[in-house]
């Protein structure tokens, strides 16, 4: 047991130095980088370097911080990648490839030669809203990182289902969705304050827990939900 502790202590300082070195070098490389794709990859490298520093602490709290950090960084990477792909597509002005949608069996050829939906099922319009509301409410009850992921799943399911059945999302909902995504920075600050409050005000642990949980819900839910919003705009 003593030898294992000595090994852990011996690699702590090199781990912290390696993490800081990778982060600083990646930030310098981003400053000199002109390619958007390379800058995106380097940004993800910086996030991995910060996770290395957190992992070097080797405590249960550090372990709890690694998973939310990985998922939030992945959500940001996917969202920015969607923006870059869309911008590249608009610049290239290439013909849009044919997209295949669900419910192809409900499409019947008309005299004009076009394929249009020739069926009206109420469940196709109401069930996505019902399932999305259930997921959002359940995610709000869970709170924290897991709750944010469940809420994001409900938002993505609603956006994708509306696109599949050919129904456009209302402008009011798009505006509200964009506003929630804009609260990402505020949610992150709320989570930081709640996290610090555990140590500064231990007697207020319940309030700090609710603050941290609410911050993670908004942060993760808005980031993952942004993917469906970008796809709808595109």
UniProtKB/Swiss-Prot annotation:
Record-annotated disulphide pairs: none
InterPro entries to which the protein is assigned, alphabetical: DUF2105_membrane, Prd_NiFe_hyd_3_EhaG
Entry protein name: Uncharacterized protein MJ0523
Keywords carried by this UniProt record: Cell membrane, Membrane, Transmembrane, Transmembrane helix
Localization annotation: Cell membrane
Originating organism: Methanocaldococcus jannaschii (strain ATCC 43067 / DSM 2661 / JAL-1 / JCM 10045 / NBRC 100440)
KW Phosphoprotein (keyword) present: no
Pfam families: DUF2105
Ranges annotated as spanning the membrane: 11-31, 52-72, 131-151, 182-202, 207-227
Membrane topology listed for this record: Multi-pass membrane protein
């Amino acid at each position: 047991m003593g030898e294992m502790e000595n090994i852990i202590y011996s690699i702590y300082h090199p781990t912290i130095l390696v993490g800081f070195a990778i982060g600083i070098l990646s930030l310098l490389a981003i400053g000199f980088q002109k390619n958007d794709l390379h800058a995106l990859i380097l940004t993800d490298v910086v996030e991995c370097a910060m996770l290395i520093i957190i992992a070097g602490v080797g405590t249960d709290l550090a372990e709890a911080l690694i998973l939310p950090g990985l998922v939030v960084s992945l959500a940001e990477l996917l969202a920015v990648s969607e923006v870059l792909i869309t911008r590249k597509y608009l610049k290239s002005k290439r013909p849009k490839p044919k997209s295949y949608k669900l419910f192809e069996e409900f499409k019947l050829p008309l005299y004009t030669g076009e394929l249009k939906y020739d069926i009206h099922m109420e469940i196709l319009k109401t069930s996505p809203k019902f399932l999305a509301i259930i997921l959002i409410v359940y995610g709000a009850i869970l709170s924290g990182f897991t709750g944010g992921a469940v809420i994001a799943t409900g938002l993505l399911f609603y956006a994708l289902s509306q696109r599949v059945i050919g129904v456009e999302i209302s402008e009011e909902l798009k505006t509200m969705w964009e506003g929630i995504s804009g609260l990402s920075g505020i949610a992150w600050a709320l989570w930081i304050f709640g996290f610090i409050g555990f140590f500064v005000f231990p007697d207020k642990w319940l309030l700090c827990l609710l603050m941290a949980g609410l911050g993670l819900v908004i942060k993760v839910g808005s980031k993952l939900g942004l993917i469906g919003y970008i796809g709808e705009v595109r």
